[in-house]
Amino acid sequence: MGTEDYTFPQGAEELHRRHHTVEAPQPQPFLKSLQYSVKETLFPDDPFRQFKNQNASRKFVLGLKYFLPIFEWAPRYNLKFFKSDLIAGITIASLAIPQGISYAKLANLPPILGLYSSFVPPLVYAVLGSSRDLAVGTVAVASLLTGAMLSKEVDAEKDPKLYLHLAFTATFFAGVLEASLGIFRLGFIVDFLSHATIVGFMGGAATVVSLQQLKGIFGLKHFTDSTDVISVMRSVFSQTHEWRWESGVLGCGFLFFLLSTRYFSIKKPKFFWVAAMAPLTSVILGSLLVYFTHAERHGVQVIGDLKKGLNPLSGSDLIFTSPYMSTAVKTGLITGIIALAEGVAVGRSFAMFKNYNIDGNKEMIAFGMMNIVGSFTSCYLTTGPFSRSAVNYNAGCKTAMSNIVMAIAVMFTLLFLTPLFHYTPLVVLSAIIISAMLGLIDYQAAIHLWKVDKFDFLVCMSAYVGVVFGSVEIGLVVAVAISIARLLLFVSRPKTAVKGNIPNSMIYRNTEQYPSSRTVPGILILEIDAPIYFANASYLRERIIRWIDEEEERVKQSGESSLQYIILDMSAVGNIDTSGISMMVEIKKVIDRRALKLVLSNPKGEVVKKLTRSKFIGDHLGKEWMFLTVGEAVEACSYMLHTFKTEPASKNEPWNNV
């Protein structure tokens, strides 16, 4: 049916002239349109606008500040800032040293790598990073994931050299991934790890990490490589005859001390440094206790000798031809995504507290470069851990200089103090890890998810259960799969609703949300709440026809004026593809067969452009049947309804003429 059936009746033309006309946007050249689309997709923050109308020298200075953020804050750095950063840097170093050693053991790597990884990467981040509060270092979850994935292919005890080389290679590929995402502005990929996914994943990983520390608490020498809770508990309770009470007492004592200091610092925020110093204090006290009591002779395992000196170069250790390379690549990609998501989220959180912005893409480049450089200097995967960054924030850091101070403190430790860690008991490291992990189990966030969004809670618990009862990889895959499934569900099943008039106004709203709103006799107003694409076109066609069926049945039963007009409110339809246009043609044909008229309200520019190019507007629908607002569309339709009276719908009249 053409537009001739949709011509305005005589007498209504004057009314139409009083209404605003829906205009299609001016056509743009293809290259200009493509450039705009790419810019909006990859550069929503328009980072290069500051370079406009600047001379060459000024552009060079701005470019230097943009690509090397250290030049943004270094020129105005002063002694007052340094005093704050010095205190913060020394404070986080006291936490970084014991945590670094602990997390390296968690990854089945030599403990010294934890110190190496707290020396070089913070220096790189201080130059490239945009966060003032992020403190760089290793993290428990990435360490656990590295150990779990690499151990499936190589035994760290039987072939420690190959295992170490794979860890460096995985770190390299993690850095390449992170830097690439930042350079090509693809950081939105990380957004597929939703808040609910991260809460569940981190909670599950923290639970698994804590349970695995029972090996150190009970002084066990043989333990499962699996991370699921059943395997871990079986390994613990099948070796009760190997439990060492000396180790258990020592571990429980230090765990109680660490948790007590943490609780005290939470209650008294001014004394945050008490909890920050507690891990190093535990290492010192534990080492002294073992040294004077010779506890290592009674089943208390110690770290042993740590190599003295700065990071050795490891570029030649990277593996690019071994059959194990695929394992390194897989480990690097997965751990890189996890570390990236955590680091960016932590940086944004503290930036929000201090009311400044960080550039997510710059952060990705910074993380990537520090891991690439780290892989050449005997470091394994690093990011911005929450615990260390929180201490840095509470210590009053002003700039990334606190990372440089921390790195210098770690350098001093590597050069002169590593022999002092010989007698550090492993059980103290286990207690430090458990204490840190308990803070990652955010049960309050899970409760909040349950109250606000049950589906998000399901995603959270799926990630948690997947990690705890399966593996870290399974939990991550399950959570991401459910998140993507939910996204696809939102896209393929958009909301549609009937709109009614708010009494004594020209406002039209969803009748379910506003029960006081009233439908207009003879007119059905439908709202489409999403772009129309191939994924939802079929659903929308069926749902719109169903709305029409239900309205005609309701009108027939009530004896009201028969349905004459279908107004589609397209305010929320930002775009439409060819499948969506085909759906509109089909809807138009269905409406024609029922002797109804289709009216469009507030179609967006992109939609009007495509409907015009496809000749839907013109061949199927006249321009006069498009209105700028629902109110204008209803006014025009009501005028024609009252001018050309319609008979009430008969109860015996068939209403479904499809």
Swiss-Prot record:
GO terms for molecular function: secondary active sulfate transmembrane transporter activity; sulfate transmembrane transporter activity; symporter activity. SUPFAM superfamilies: SpoIIaa-like. Its main location: membrane. Residues 107-108, 155-163, 207-245, 293-332, 385-398, 447-464 are extracellular. Keywords: Membrane, Stress response, Sulfate transport, Symport, Transmembrane, Transmembrane helix, Transport. Induction: By nitrogen starvation, but not by sulfate starvation. The chain crosses the membrane at residues 86-106, 109-129, 134-154, 164-184, 186-206, 246-266, 272-292, 333-353, 364-384, 399-419, 426-446, 465-485. It is a multi-pass membrane protein. Expressed only in leaves. Signal peptide: none annotated. It is found in: Membrane. GO terms for cellular component: chloroplast; membrane. InterPro entries: S04_transporter_CS, SLC26A/SulP_dom, SLC26A/SulP_fam, STAS_dom, STAS_dom_sf. Residues 1-85, 130-133, 185, 267-271, 354-363, 420-425, 486-658 are cytoplasmic. Residues 513-637 form the STAS domain. Gene3D superfamilies: STAS domain. Belongs to the SLC26A/SulP transporter (TC 2.A.53) family. NCBIfam families: sulP (TIGR00815). H(+)/sulfate cotransporter that may play a role in the regulation of sulfate assimilation. This is Sulfate transporter 3.1. It comes from Arabidopsis thaliana (Mouse-ear cress). The lineage of its organism: Eukaryota, Viridiplantae, Streptophyta, Embryophyta, Tracheophyta.
